[in-house]
Amino acid sequence: MSIPGNSRRRGSRLLTTNQLVFSSHPSSRLIIGEGCAPSLLQFALLDESRVTMRCRLAHLLTAAMEGVVLLLVPCAVWPFGSVHAYFQWLLIVGVGLLLVLWAARTLVEGRLVWVSCPIALGLATLCLLVIVQVIPLSAGAVGILAPGTASLRGALLPAAPEPVGGGSLTTSSVPAATLSLDAGATRDGLLQLVAVVALFAAVRNNLRYPAFFYRLAWVCAANGVALALVGMGQLASSPSNVVFWSVPTRGAVFGPFICRNHFAYYANLCLGLTAGLLLGTRYFQGLATEVRRPDREPQLAWREMFRDPRVLWLAACLAIVGAGLVASLSRGGILGLIAGGGTAVVMLMARRATLRWAMLAGTVSLSLLLACWFGFDRVSHRWQNIWHDNVAAESRVAVWQRTLPLTARFAVWGSGLGTFERVEQLTRVPGDSWNVLHDHAHSDFLELWIEGGTIQLLIALVIIGLVVHRGARAFSRHASNSMGFLALGGLAGFIAVVVQSFVDFGLHIPAVAVLTAVVAASLANLAETPPTDALPATPEPRPQGWGFPVALLQAALLAAVALFLVSTAHRAEQAERFRLASRAVTADRRVDYLKAAVALAPERVELRLSLVDALLRRADASASRSRAIMPLTLGPTPSVPGLAAVLALTNGIPGPVFQDGTDLREAKTQALIARQLSPLQFDAQEVCLRLGVESDGPERALDRLLLLSPSMPEPWLQAGRLALGRGDRSKAYVCWRNALRANEGLLAEIGRAVPHEISPRELLDQVLPPNPAMIFDVVAKGAVQGLSSEDERRFCRAALALLAEKGEKRIAEDFLLEARIHTRLDDVDAAINAYRAALAKKPRAPAWRLELCQLLYRTGNYAEARRELILLRSEAPANSQVNDLYHQVLRAEQQ
């Protein structure tokens, strides 16, 4: 192959004039330019073997990279989606190996191995913005760049130094402020993001030949079938929360995924690639173009198609994976499939109006039959409640509406990658669910907007648009051959992932992120590959251009990134291993294990809080074996035992007493550092209050707890006690009302203040929320002792007034409550009418009907009681209480 010009590079040597030029491929023929000296010819012949060896070595390195990727994609799924630290480390080791092989190829070819790609540039920009979030900055710089973050940090951290063991822990003793409100969580997210970007870049720059995408599609087809079969097998033979028939979880599992929605992400990508393989067979050659095969009659082509094992296997794969997707009950996954499939159909119809719908219809029908076999009732019931899905205790829409204002609070830089779980609690109000944490927003885009700000969201949308554009270009460029359909299938799967990400958070699962990145890189590569029907096994390295020093610099950079990824992931995995091991050892060994974990991952706040707990337990055990310390609670729990210090301040109740010593001083230091690392961490704030290291007093510390989690009841209760002890009655009333909104079970606790600290009228008018059931409980359950008969009637009338305000919106339970209140007031006729109204709205309520019968019997309405009891006995013939009352009524009638 002759290259025109006076100057070209061959390998790493530059030859000029009438130069000898040859192809880098071993099978190429040697061509000699005119006027070439014999010595130059001899030099070229000697150097040809070196170039051939370099080509072969480059081919081997590329093949090794392909093997690593084709191993990572399926293997990342089976260990629970690689969500645990150990499996994430193994996954990152694979990415590091890819980078090392890439660096070796760069050195072998002696050139810069890099393709200009705006998608890679966008991903690198995202990484850079996340790095900025964790850079230590001064308080003034944070205030200028992120006023919302600075104001929140100022509200959550005291300004004065706090005493530790006779001294004080100054701001120089703890990490500096960052744009992220939890630098440790953001660094964990940054590690995963860099790994995904590195994987994308490795595929984008090295596996650019169509054969890789073809083999990837076959691997995904086989893996998708295996996942669907395992998932449907578990569905038929195992509880819905058990993975692999032996591992219980808290989620609704499907296959190896803890959440069934995450299977839908992976399944949609597998479905798209499998459909691309099927449409890429020779029987669909004219599907996307107007060109027909003249050598095949339509009838003959159809007969051959149904005799082709490859077509039958691919159709079966589509049916099985499709049935698995439907059986997973993932509505977001189905919506994504409709969006991706609809896009593919529109693109096909735009190129050709006549399609072979029979194969598609048969595949869809088979999928529906399999779905019916595994229970169509479950599927239809799931879709009937599409807008009423619960994310733990509240719907997705409620979470989105509540957290959307956070996008304005952290508009530019965001709150920090991985901080949604903490900032979400800031948006709650008393009465919201307080014992459930939302670790994700169930919308990747909303979560990115909150954590990364508007800049990162816009960059992510641009990246998605570029991938879709490259996918459409790849389909258009290869429409005349099988790779065009494969590009169309990959694009459909990618669009399905994007659409589902609006209502789910599957891109946080490493296995899903890996496959999505590989498919996106392959689409970008295919958009730049010349149209061809051939599927070359390996690429041809073409030495050219920039010289060995640049190649050496790139290799060093790749090796450094690989070392950073692997070492950081290994330290995180070892820290998690020490944390888990600390649960099964003695107190002394537990402290040692947790210290080792903190040394490996010093910015993980949870590790420091666990160490504080271990130190306090050891200090308490050494001081008194007869007294136990109440354990710290990671996350909201039904009680906050750490507030015993506030109880001691308000009521004189002695709280935990720690003897000052090394363990206690170290516990205080670790608690303060944990709070400085993550001011949003409720447990860090709580333990600082518990240990008495607050420099601005317990009242200010309680205000911080209330700011962090307004829906938790215990801080409101203790804040009310503290305010009442200091004479601020109006604040005490507000705090106690919020406590009752959050937890009605605190009514008895607050009722103890009557009549010594507050009067019954103050309790009714100032403290109790407008809840008729709670107001009636004060009387019915004796939550407040010593009420006079007039006070009881006042509470009952207040409850009735609130019920009357509901008007026609009253439900059966409201009428039941009204009946009980009238019974308490001895208003029999009104009570009977209310009971009948409740039973009219809810006829099959035996307990309510029994209450009505008892009331009728007590008031002498025996005939009505007997009629109601006859009806009740038909509903509950074995109820002894009903039968006894029936016989009593009969005897009363006879007398």
Tell me the role of every PLM-derived stretch.
Residues 10, 43-45, 49-82, 89-103, ...:
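Alpha-helical transmembrane segments of multi-pass inner-membrane proteins
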Residues 139-160, 271-294, 612-643:
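Internal, charge-rich low-complexity segments
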Residues 140-180, 406, 418, 422-426:
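Extracytosolic (periplasmic/ER-lumenal) interhelical loops and adjacent juxtamembrane/interface segments
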Residues 375-391, 543-588:
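Hydrophobic alpha-helical transmembrane segments in integral membrane proteins
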